[in-house]
Curated annotation (Swiss-Prot):
Keywords: Ribonucleoprotein, Ribosomal protein. GO terms for molecular function: structural constituent of ribosome. It comes from Photobacterium profundum (strain SS9). GO terms for biological process: translation. The keyword Transcription regulation does not apply. This is Large ribosomal subunit protein bL36. The gene is rpmJ. The keyword Ribonucleoprotein applies. Transmembrane segments: none annotated. GO terms for cellular component: cytoplasm; ribonucleoprotein complex; ribosome. Belongs to the bacterial ribosomal protein bL36 family. HAMAP family: Ribosomal_bL36. Pfam families: Ribosomal_L36.
Length: 37
């Protein structure tokens, strides 16, 4: 899980999800998991 000020989709499997006001990227590739904060 990477914590970044700006989250971007890395590949076409990445999905942007907003959970409790936190923007997250989920993907089948674990390295691509990110959250904003």
């Amino acid at each position: 899980m990477k914590v970044r000020a700006s989250v971007k989709k890395i590949c076409r499997n990445c999905k942007v999800i907003k959970r409790n006001g936190v923007v997250r990227i989920i993907c089948i590739e674990p390295k691509h998991k990110q959250r904003q904060g």
